[in-house]
């Protein structure tokens, strides 16, 4: 068996003249959590669907658990898609029973948080409870690889933390995990990161590897709202973090010139760039 639970070799997917994924190579090994990052439309979901055999490649090859991504190998995988993959007109326990029968597995015990809603239709549950249900379904047959597409999107911070405890427990138990996320604090919990932009893999490794030589400055001024509007109107990339203004990949002199012309005084100082700022720079370059 291969040392990787997931593998893509120079994978490309085209839809007509549009290239959604362009010559991407990547791996996921047992026991590690790999974060797949990128803006909307970067190609993350298309790549995942090819890795799982749900979408054919135009070029290149994929492997799931050392073999083709067929039904036999998918039976050893757990998958939580963006839409959760649950039957909204069935109850929580009915969803679990259906999945257990499909995988010839025992019906799993419900976590305490779902015990009181076991007979509730999934469509009537809060989003956090739906995501917890999707996790229980995906883990019921003890998968060797777990693929999670935006698994915590739209849920509260406590629910996100609980779901990430589950993700880490799966990796600690030997499963390989591939997860997409828009939350940078979640990216920091991954063992390794992959960054996609415009269908291509543009960075991999640690957080520092992803950020690379991207630079950023912080702009401090009491009139933060006006400052943001001025910089935005000058086509300068701006990120607003509360009332703090950050500007990636821009000469401080350019920022000072735009603000001085509008009569705004501000303190401009270099700061360490973030993954989010690297993604913004890449999006503007394309």
Residue ranges: model-predicted function:
Residues 52:
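Helix-to-loop junction immediately C-terminal to a conserved catalytic motif
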Residues 165-178, 182-249:
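ABC transporter nucleotide-binding domain
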Residues 250-286:
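C-terminal coupling/interaction segments
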Residues 59-73, 112:
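Conserved ABC transporter NBD signature motif
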Residues 146-150:
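Catalytic Walker B motif of ABC-type/P-loop ATPase nucleotide-binding domains
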């Amino acid at each position: 068996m291969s040392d990787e639970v997931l593998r893509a070799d120079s994978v490309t997917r085209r839809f007509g003249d549009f290239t959604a994924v362009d010559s991407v190579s990547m791996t996921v090994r047992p026991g590690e959590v790999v974060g797949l990052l990128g803006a909307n439309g970067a190609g993350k979901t298309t790549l995942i669907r090819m890795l799982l055999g749900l979408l054919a490649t135009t070029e290149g090859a994929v492997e799931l658990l050392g073999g083709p991504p067929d039904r036999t190998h998918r039976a050893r995988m757990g998958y939580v898609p963006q839409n959760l993959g649950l039957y909204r007109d069935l109850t929580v326990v009915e969803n679990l029973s259906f999945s257990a029968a499909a995988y010839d597995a025992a019906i799993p015990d419900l976590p305490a948080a779902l015990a009181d809603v076991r007979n509730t239709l999934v469509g009537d549950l809060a989003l956090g409870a739906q995501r917890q249900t999707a996790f229980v379904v995906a883990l019921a047959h003890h998968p060797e690889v777990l693929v999670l597409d935006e698994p915590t999107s739209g849920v509260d911070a406590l629910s996100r933390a609980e779901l990430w405890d589950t993700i880490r427990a799966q990796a600690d138990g030997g499963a390989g995990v591939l997860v997409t996320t828009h939350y940078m604090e979640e990216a920091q919990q991954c063992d390794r990161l992959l960054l996609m932009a415009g269908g291509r893999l543009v960075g991999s490794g640690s957080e520092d590897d992803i950020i690379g030589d991207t630079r950023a400055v912080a702009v401090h001024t009491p009139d933060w709202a006006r400052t943001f509007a001025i910089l935005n109107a000058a086509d300068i990339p701006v990120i607003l973090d509360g009332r703090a203004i950050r500007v990636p990949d821009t000469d401080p002199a350019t920022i000072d010139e735009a603000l001085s012309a509008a009569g705004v005084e501000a303190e401009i100082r270099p700061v360490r760039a973030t993954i989010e700022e690297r993604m913004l720079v890449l999006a503007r370059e394309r």
